[in-house]
C-alpha cells in the first residue's frame, strides 16, 4: 500500500526513460506519454511559453512544447514535476523542508546524469535514479503520518545514520521502501537496485549503485545534503573505479551539473 498513495507521474517518468533509450523515438510517442497527466501537460505548455523558450506564436500543443524544449529537457522537467508533486510539504518526520528535498534530488540527479557519460552509462536512466533517490523516505514519511505521527529523526540520537532510525521506527529502511515502491511502478531492475542499495555499495557490481553513492556524496559536500546520511558515503578508490569515473576527470562534469542545476532551479516550471 506504500506506493498507492502517489500520483501517476513517476509511471510516466519510467515509461519516458524506456522510450528515450531509443535514439529514433518519435515525437508522437513522447507526447502521448505526457498527455496521461493533464497537470503535467499544462506545465509543459506553460514552460514552452516562458521567456526562456518563447516563440512569436504562443504554443498550444504538447507536441510543439516537446519539440521546442527537446527530449532530454522534457525528461528532466517531468522529473522536476515528480519532485514538486511529492515533496510539497517536505519530509516532516525527517525534518527536511521541501526546498532542501528538491535541491538534493535535483542536484544528485544532474550530477549522476553528467557522471554517467564518462562511465558509459545511460544518462536518462542515471538522472531518474538520482532524482528518485529519496523516494523511500517520501513513502516512509507518508507512513509516519498515520502510523507514527510523533516520529522525528534527530541527528544527535546515538549518532547513527538515518537508516538505523528508520528500521527502529518503521521496521524498514528508505532503501527497502524504495524497492517496494519502484517495483510497483514497474521501473527497470537496475534502477530499483541502484536506489535500494546505494547506502552500501561495497561489494556490489552495478556501476549505477556506485555512481549514486558518489553523486549523493558530492551533493552533500557542495552543501545540498540531507541529515543522517554522511556515514553512508564512501571515500574509496573502489567507488570511483566501480562507478567508472576517473576522479581527475570528474570536475568538468560536476561544473556542468551545477550550470544545469542553476537553470532548472530558476525555471518557472
Where are the predicted features?
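Conserved alpha-helical "signature site"
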Residues: 1-150, 155-156, 160-237
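Terminal helices and disordered tails flanking the catalytic cores of nucleotide-processing hydrolases
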Residues: 217, 237-269
Amino acid at each position: 500500500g506504500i506506493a498507492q498513495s502517489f500520483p501517476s507521474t513517476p509511471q510516466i517518468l519510467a515509461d519516458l526513460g524506456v522510450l528515450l533509450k531509443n535514439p529514433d523515438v518519435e515525437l508522437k510517442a513522447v507526447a502521448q506519454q505526457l498527455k496521461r497527466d493533464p497537470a503535467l501537460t499544462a506545465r509543459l505548455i506553460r514552460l514552452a511559453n516562458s521567456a526562456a523558450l518563447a516563440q512569436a506564436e504562443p504554443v498550444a500543443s504538447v507536441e510543439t512544447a516537446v519539440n521546442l524544449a527537446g527530449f532530454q529537457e522534457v525528461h528532466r522537467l517531468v522529473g522536476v514535476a515528480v519532485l514538486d508533486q511529492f515533496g510539497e510539504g517536505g519530509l516532516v518526520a525527517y525534518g527536511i523542508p521541501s526546498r532542501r528535498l528538491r535541491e538534493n534530488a535535483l542536484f544528485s540527479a544532474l550530477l549522476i546524469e553528467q557522471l554517467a557519460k564518462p562511465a558509459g552509462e545511460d544518462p536518462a536512466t542515471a538522472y531518474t535514479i538520482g532524482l528518485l533517490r529519496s523516494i523511500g523516505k517520501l513513502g516512509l514519511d507518508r507512513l509516519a503520518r498515520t502510523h507514527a505521527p510523533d516520529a522525528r529523526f534527530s541527528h544527535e540520537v546515538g549518532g547513527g545514520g538515518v537508516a538505523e532510525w528508520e528500521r527502529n521506527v518503521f521496521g524498514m529502511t528508505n532503501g527497502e521502501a524504495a524497492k517496494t515502491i519502484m517495483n510497483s511502478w514497474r521501473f527497470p531492475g537496475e534502477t530499483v537496485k541502484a536506489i535500494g542499495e546505494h547506502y552500501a555499495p561495497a561489494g556490489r557490481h552495478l556501476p549505477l549503485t556506485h555512481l549514486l553513492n558518489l553523486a549523493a556524496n558530492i551533493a552533500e559536500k557542495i552543501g545540498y545534503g540531507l541529515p543522517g546520511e554522511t556515514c553512508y558515503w564512501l571515500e574509496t578508490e573502489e567507488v570511483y573505479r566501480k562507478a567508472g569515473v576517473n576522479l581527475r576527470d570528474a570536475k568538468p562534469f560536476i561544473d556542468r551539473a551545477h550550470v544545469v542545476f542553476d537553470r532548472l532551479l530558476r525555471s518557472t516550471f
